Amino acid sequence: MDAIKKKMLAMKMEKENALDRAEQVEQKLRDCECNKNKVEEDLNNLQKKFAILENDFDSINEQLLDANTKLEASEKKNAEIESETAGLQRRIQLLEEDLERSEERLQSATEKLEEASKAADESERGRKVLESRSLADDERLDGLEAQLKEAKYIAEDAERKFDEAARKLAITEVDLERAEARLEAAEAKILELEEELKVVGNNMKSLEISEQEASQREDSYEETIRDLTQRLKDAENRASEAERTVSKLQKEVDRLEDELLAEKERYKATSDELDSTFAELAGY
């Protein structure tokens, strides 16, 4: 009877120990489940951060491409402006040369007109001298008349030359007015071009500043890209580590579940044995 009681006490203690071990296993299982959930949550957070980093990386790449496109457009615009400026400077030079030639023609016509005027004055003086001498010397009248006719011819010729010179002068004046008008237009265009050049200079300065800023932003983007790439690698490493940790925890959970199942089976066997023992005692 004492042996049976000792056996019952031993079985009871074994049962209590089995219950304690089962509770410990269940606690470990709950802890593992909690750790597993935490790791899975960390893994989800890392995956979200990884997606955000990928979006930031794509956005920065798009901004960098846009900055490069704007820089190429500004450089092309500067080249077009420089080409147009060179063409306008060439046109101004041609207008100045045309004006110089017009001034030379005007000066030549003026000199010819002065020569014709001097010849007419000389003829007029000769005619007056001949008229005054005709009263005193009748014998020289025929000669003087001949000289007068010649003088008239010279005067008429000079008059024709004067008219021709006047006509050429009028043409020259028209050419001069046109040249002056072209010169005024050219001067106005020069002023306009100077203003445009000032604006272009300011724009070029702004573009240089923008280019420097774009270069700085590009350096910053490259640094950001390197940082994001490193962070991406770190995130991938952490994700891999988290996956390995989850795998280990899953194995531990499986092991603890197996232990719990074994403890439950041992508990069931102990309970069945106690029930059988109690039934035998009740039979006595």
Swiss-Prot record:
The record's listing under Gene3D superfamilies reads: 1.20.5.170, 1.20.5.340
Which stretches are annotated as coiled coil?
Answer: 1-284
Q: Which InterPro entries did the record assign?
A: Tropomyosin
Top-rank taxon of the source lineage equals Eukaryota
Q: Does the keyword Cytoplasm apply?
A: no
Chain intervals for the UniProt region annotation (Disordered): 105-131
Which SUPFAM superfamilies does this UniProt record tie to the protein? Answer: Tropomyosin
Keywords, A to Z? Allergen, Coiled coil, Repeat
Matching PANTHER family, A to Z?
A: TROPOMYOSIN (PTHR19269)
What family does the entry list? Belongs to the tropomyosin family.
Role according to the record: Tropomyosin, in association with the troponin complex, plays a central role in the calcium dependent regulation of muscle contraction.
Q: What is known of its domains?
A: The molecule is in a coiled coil structure that is formed by 2 polypeptide chains. The sequence exhibits a prominent seven-residues periodicity.
Q: Quaternary form?
A: Homodimer.
List the protein's name. Tropomyosin
Name the species this protein comes from: Cornu aspersum (Brown garden snail)
